[in-house]
Amino acid sequence: MPTADETAALVRAGDVRASARLMRDLDDARPGAVDVMKRLYPHTGRAYVLGITGNPGAGKSTVVDALIDYYRKAGKRVGVVAVDPSSPFSGGAILGDRIRMQRHATDDGVFIRSLATRGHLGGLSRSTSDVVAVLDAMGFDVVIVETVGVGQDEVDVVSQAETAVVVTVPGLGDEIQAIKAGILEIADVLVVNKSDREGADRTVRDLTHMLELRPHEAEPVEIVRTVATMGKGIDELAKACERHRERGARAPEVEPAAGANGPTSERRRRRALATVREHVLDTMRRAVDETLAARGELVERVATRALDPYSAADELVRAITRGRADE
C-alpha cells in the first residue's frame, strides 16, 4: 500500500489508477485519503473550474459534452465531475454520465468521474471539492462540475466553480419561475439551450428583463444561445466564460489575513470558506455517527420517552467535545 507521499506524487504525475483510487477513497471517506489531500492542496489552484447547472431536461450533459470537444480542440485537458442522484439502495450514481459521454472514454486528455449525492441537501456530494482538487493536481486545465437539477440547491455549485453557468431551455413552462426562485443569483453566464425551438426569443427577453432588475453594482451576466446537440453557440459560450474569468482576475484583491501567503479575491475567499465549512460539517457528521453508535442507549431512552431529544443532543455534544479534547 503506497504512503500518502507516494500517492500524492503519483497523482501529481497524472497516474490515472492512483488518482481514481484516491477519488474512490474520498467518496467512501476511507482513512488516509485526507492525508493525501493535505499534501496535494499546495499544488492546486491552477485549473479553471466551470460549474454547469440548471433545470432537469435543459440538456446540461449535452452542453458539457460539447464543451469537452471545444476545449480538447484548443489543446486543453479536461476533467469532468458529474454529480448524479444516488440510488437509494446502493448509494451509487444512477444517471451514468460515462455512458452519455462515452465517446471521450478513449481520450487520455479527458477524465470523467461520476459522484452520487448520497442524499446531500445541496446538489453537490460531500467529496466533490476534493475530486476537483485531485483533477487540478493531476494537471487538467479545465475541470467541469455538472450538478443535478434540483432547484435552489444548485447554489452549491458556486462554492466549487470560478464561473457558474445556468442552463435553461424554451418550452419548460416554469423554467423562468424556477430561475427566479434563486438560481439566477448564482449565474455568471446564462445559456438558452435548444434555442432553435419555438419560444427561444421570449426566453431570452424574459432573462434579459430579469437581469435588468438586479442591483446596478451586480456583475454583468451574459446570455448565450446554444443548440448543443449540433455544437452551435458552444464557441460563444466558452468565450463568455473566459470573459467572466478575466473579469474575476481583474477584480480588486482583498488584503490578506495574518499567516496568508498573499492577497486574494473575495470570490476565491468565499470558495475557501465554503470548502472549509463543508469539511468541518463532514467531520462533525462522522463524529456524531460514531458517538451515536457507541451510545446506543441514548436513542433507546429517547424512543421510550425516558429522555427528551434535546437533552440527548446536549449529552451527545458533550461526549464529542470530551473525545476531541482527549485526542
Annotate each language-model stretch with its function.
Residues 157, 170-198:
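Flexible active-site lid/hinge loop adjacent to a nucleotide/diphosphate
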Residues 189, 195-247:
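Canonical P-loop GTPase G-domain recognition
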Residues 54:
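The Walker A (P-loop) glycine that initiates the GxxxxGKT/S ATP-binding motif of P-loop NTPases
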Residues 4, 19-20, 33, 204, ...:
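A general structural signal for well-ordered alpha-helical segments in protein cores
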Residues 3-50, 58, 64-175:
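Nucleotide-state-sensitive switch-loop elements of NTP-binding domains
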Residues 81, 167, 192-193, 226:
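Generic beta-sheet signal
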Residues 225-228, 236-324:
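Long, well-ordered amphipathic alpha-helical subdomains in the mid-to-C-terminal portions
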Residues 94, 131, 156, 160, ...:
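Alpha-helical scaffold elements adjacent to nucleotide-binding pockets in ATP/GTP-utilizing enzyme cores
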